[in-house]
A protein has these predicted regions:
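Carboxylate-rich, polar loop motifs that coordinate divalent cations or form catalytic acidic clusters
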Residues: 1-488
Length: 488
């Protein structure tokens, strides 16, 4: 099968040589202000597009951090960053002071040096909900300023029904908490107490939601609760234990998957079993829905499976391994950006989904193709607009790909200078006649027409030369003015 041409990109790779704190990356996140945060095995690096600023802990720095290895980052509704370290401790980085805050130390009676965080979620009202194993759930609040984080409420584990097994918070500030004893709780926005909605035979493992309901999935059933009043409807499962659930906002449908590979759709007050055409996954581990209503199924098999409700069929995608033999990575992810759906597959495989061809195409990582630039075991990736950030297991470091929406042609200058830096461009300008003027570090000035053919070259300027060209400007008469470094 002929491969599609991948999107044209401009690539850049960053490592410790460029200022990153470590080349092993555990998470990548682009925040609401455009900064890129990179969690590494030795601290956090923040990239502003030009330089890295690193955050970590060293002996004697009085930092509250208990570990220098970071594994995840998220952002609350006020723009503050929340980090999880390797020992499952959680910290807030105040965006204004750029100082870490030990949030769990605010919880009375909790040893902030010895605990394990299991869930950290943000609502839309400045609240962050943190579940602590064996203790309960803390709700923290903050503001869009330099003020420190505060604790708003704490919900004890015995009152909730044991340790938290799944949690969901909405933008309005409501929280839905499922616990080990099979209890489903709801905490309304701003409230200090939890309301028990029902009890289930097995503890819940996941939540999803649509505009009207919150769905709580257990091995035996799906509990549907009204967002406004919390009224509960039980939807019994099938023969095999349920293992995944997702809401598709396009078709307004909720899907559930099972351990034996069955796929269900919520239909009225029951789970209706689907029988798609194609090879059925052996065991469904996760479900995700994209902006076109396609459901992506993660199973025990390498790769990923597409379920299309419009055609009611499965299609499995898998790439040949192109990484080290000892790579093990069972996390999958789909994300949309640059007009494309990006897919990180189970075990190995990374690419974008071509909707017209119904294929997951490799992204510069097929060793059989001449454009291959990287291996295909991606540790983490993040995409925002037309910029894709990723890190591969083998090459390490941080790779940036700027997706070009319009085709671009790259050409080099035919310099006559023996200086290897003579082609380094320092000034660009397009004049009123559509010609592109290029000034170089070595003092060359060249104009190109619309066909990228050189139509003018600045003659030699004596023994001293032109000097490094740093600025170009056209005046109202069409004259071109050249600014140099030290030569006028």
């Amino acid at each position: 099968i002929a491969r599609a041409t991948p999107p044209q990109c401009l690539f850049q790779t960053y490592s410790t040589l460029d200022g990153m704190t470590h080349d092993r990356i555990a998470d990548i996140y682009t925040d609401s202000r455009g900064f890129v945060w990179v969690c590494t095995w030795y601290g956090v690096s923040r990239f502003d597009g030009y330089t890295f600023k690193n955050f970590s802990t060293t002996p004697g720095d009085f930092s509250p951090l208990s570990h220098h290895r970071f594994i995840s980052v998220s952002e609350d509704s006020n723009g503050h960053l929340w980090f999880t370290t390797y020992n499952f401790h959680v910290y807030r980085l105040n965006r204004y002071t750029e100082q870490f805050e030990d949030v769990v130390s605010l919880v009375e009676g909790v040893d902030s040096q010895h605990y394990r965080m299991t869930h950290c979620l943000h609502d839309g009202r400045g609240g962050t909900w943190v579940a602590i194993a064996g203790l309960g759930v803390a709700r923290f609040g903050d503001a869009d300023d330099a003020s420190p984080v505060r604790i708003d409420a704490f919900f004890d584990a015995p009152v909730l029904g044991g340790d938290v097994t799944a949690m969901y918070v909405d933008n309005g500030g409501d929280a839905w908490i499922a616990t080990a004893d099979g209890r489903l709780n709801r905490v309304a926005a701003g409230e200090q107490t939890a309301r028990a909605l029902c009890e289930t035979a097995a503890p819940a493992f996941s939540f999803t939601a649509d505009a009207d309901y919150v769905y709580c999935a257990t091995a035996d059933e799906v509990v549907r609760a009204g967002r406004k009043n919390g009224d509960v409807t039980r939807l019994p499962g099938g023969g095999a234990p349920l293992t995944a659930i997702v809401a598709d906002s396009v078709r307004r449908t909720v899907y559930a998957g099972s351990r034996s590979g069955e796929l269900y759709r919520v239909s009225g007050d029951r789970l209706a079993r689907l029988n798609p055409k194609g090879a059925r996954p052996r065991r469904i581990r996760d479900l995700a829905a994209d902006s076109h209503g396609i459901v992506w199924v993660t199973s025990a098999e390498t790769g990923i499976t597409r379920y299309n409700p419009a055609t009611d069929d499965y299609k499995h995608f898998e790439q040949q391994p192109y990484t080290v033999s000892y790579n093990i990575d069972t996390l999958t992810k789909i994300a949309e950006g640059g007009g494309l759906l990006w897919i990180k597959m189970n075990n190995w495989g990374f690419g974008y989904y071509d909707r017209d061809r119904d294929e997951v195409e490799p992204f510069y990582n097929d060793p059989k193709l001449p454009n291959c630039q990287m291996t295909n075991a991606v540790v983490r990736f993040d995409v925002r607009d037309d910029v894709l950030w990723l890190s591969t297991y083998h090459e390490r470091g941080l790779r940036k790909a700027v997706i070009l929406r319009q085709p671009a042609e790259v050409f080099t200058l035919d310099s006559k200078s023996p200086n290897p830096l003579s082609g380094e461009i320092r000034a660009l300008m397009t004049d009123s006649r559509g010609r592109m003027w290029v000034g170089t570090r070595d003092g060359e000035l060249i104009a190109f027409d619309a066909a990228n053919k050189p139509v003018y070259t600045l003659p030699a300027q004596g023994r001293r030369g032109t000097g490094m060209i740093y600025a170009l400007k056209e005046d109202s008469s069409g004259n071109i003015w050249v600014g140099t470094k030290g030569e006028g």
